[in-house]
């Protein structure tokens, strides 16, 4: 496993963690809250963002304007059945989602959820490290690289692991501040 591949895979783990963070609701409206919602549209599971334009007219409202008005009911149903905890208001042309302010208990729950996502990201990074070090050891055992080269490569992999784990920690810290800001 090349060092560039290790770095690329670790970067993807950080990006996946960031995508998970974006699904956590803060006190402000954010279109990424709806990223994971899929709508049963004429019998096929379709992502909401491919059926409608999503905008944020103000800090506490999400506005969904379907490209096809006949999909309004299906979109409304998908939002109601999702776990985002918002009730859609349909006026026949636009669906609005009002984002209520978060209670302090809910904020604490969301911080715990963010910490869980961060831990999952760090576990993924450590798994990449483990795989890389295993492949370095195999190369060393087979005699393809020397013991010194193996140690150097393992040190480089560890430095990458530390770097990307710190990135995840920074993302978590930023998300916690975002969630706890009233």
Swiss-Prot record:
The listed locations are:
Cytoplasm
Its principal location?
cytoplasm
Q: Which GO terms describe its cellular component?
A: cytoplasm
Superkingdom of the source?
Answer: Bacteria
Q: Which UniProt keywords apply?
A: Cytoplasm, Protein biosynthesis
Q: List, alphabetically, the Pfam families matched.
A: RRF
**NCBIfam families listed in its UniProt record:** frr
Name the UniProt record assigns to this protein: Ribosome-recycling factor
Q: Which organism was this protein described from?
A: Synechococcus elongatus (strain ATCC 33912 / PCC 7942 / FACHB-805)
